[in-house]
Amino acid sequence: MFENFREKLQTVQQDFTSGIKTLSDKSKEAKVKKKQRRDEYLPQYSAGVELLSRYEDTWVALHKRAKESAKSGETVDGEVVMLCAHWEKRRGAVLELQEQLQQIPTFLSDLETITSRIAHLEADFEEMESRLVYLEDLCAQCEHQRFKQFQILQLENYKKKKRKELESCKAELDAEHAQKVLEMEHAQQVKLKERRKYFEEAFQQDMEQYLSTGYLQITDRRDPLGSMSSMEVNVDLLEQMDLTDVSDHEALDVFLSSVGEESSAVSPDAGGPSLEPGSSPSDISLKVPSQSELRHNISSISSSCTDTVSGTTEGPDEEESSSGDSPLVQSDEEEVHADTALMGLPETEALKSSDDSDTQAP
């Protein structure tokens, strides 16, 4: 459109220049004709002046209009140039916009591809996050297992240490206990030997007195022998024993009356059992009527003494518990049970054998 306008302006300018040329040519021709007419006819100066002034006025008006048209043409040309530059810029923008509009489908396809890739990346990121969480869990489990193994190792070492200490302490305690047991057994053996010796001597004295006089005399208290304090207490308890029948008191009276009758029948000079005038109420004497009854009474007395000795050797606790009550002596009619606490000891067997030999000696 602007090119057409420019072409029109150029054609107008050419037409204007051609018109001016034609006018100049016509004026030249008119001058030539005037000269010819001047020659032919007489000049008319007033008409020429009028024409000249008129042509001069028209040429001035034309020249002024030409200048004005030239200025307007230059102004229009500048504006046309500016419009051309502006529209060239707009045309470039439009072309760029057209190219961009043509690239919109490609952009949309690329955008869809990027969106799908972003979705895949999001899924990959989620999977990676889950893997990282699982890895953290595995690391925590490994750390826990490592700490657990370390604690188990420390516990095993502590158990081994304490087991060794326990074994060493147990060995020391076992050795100390064995030493104490040996010492206690040795002391018990010594004490049993001393008691056996003491009771054997006391029994031998009682047997000698009984065999020589025919009476068994029990006093309130005897003099202590040596430094055997524990045995003195036991002997004092034995000496303070009262002849009491557990089952029936009448059996003892019957036994004493029968023994008195038989002793009076066999030895009338000796007399029945009675208290001596100088003896205390606690001194009890029994007279043997015959040799067979004497042996029978000796065996029963030896068995009761053996039971008493075994009862006194059972321990200091039983001695203290029995010291509060009055000691009891079983009658000859009851069955005598031997103490099983000292049956395994050779000293008790030797004591029984010595008692049997003493009872069979008369």
From Swiss-Prot:
Start-end of Low complexity biased regions: 271-282, 298-314
Database matches in Pfam families: Dysbindin
InterPro entries, per database record: Dysbindin
Keywords: Coiled coil, Cytoplasm, Cytoplasmic vesicle, Endoplasmic reticulum, Endosome, Membrane, Nucleus, Synapse
GO cellular component terms, semicolon-separated: axon cytoplasm; BLOC-1 complex; endoplasmic reticulum; endosome membrane; melanosome membrane; neuron projection; nucleus; plasma membrane
Main location: cytoplasm
Topology versus the membrane: Peripheral membrane protein
Domain of life: Eukaryota
Localization terms from the record: Cytoplasm; Cytoplasmic vesicle membrane; Cytoplasmic vesicle, Secretory vesicle, Synaptic vesicle membrane; Endosome membrane
The protein's assembly and partners: Component of the biogenesis of lysosome-related organelles complex 1 (BLOC-1).
Annotated family: Belongs to the dysbindin family.
Its biological purpose: Component of the BLOC-1 complex, a complex that is required for normal biogenesis of lysosome-related organelles (LRO), such as platelet dense granules and melanosomes. Plays a role in intracellular vesicle trafficking. Plays a role in synaptic vesicle trafficking and in neurotransmitter release. May be required for normal dopamine homeostasis in the cerebral cortex, hippocampus, and hypothalamus. Plays a role in the regulation of cell surface exposure of DRD2. Contributes to the regulation of dopamine signaling. May play a role in actin cytoskeleton reorganization and neurite outgrowth.
Record-given protein name: Dysbindin-A
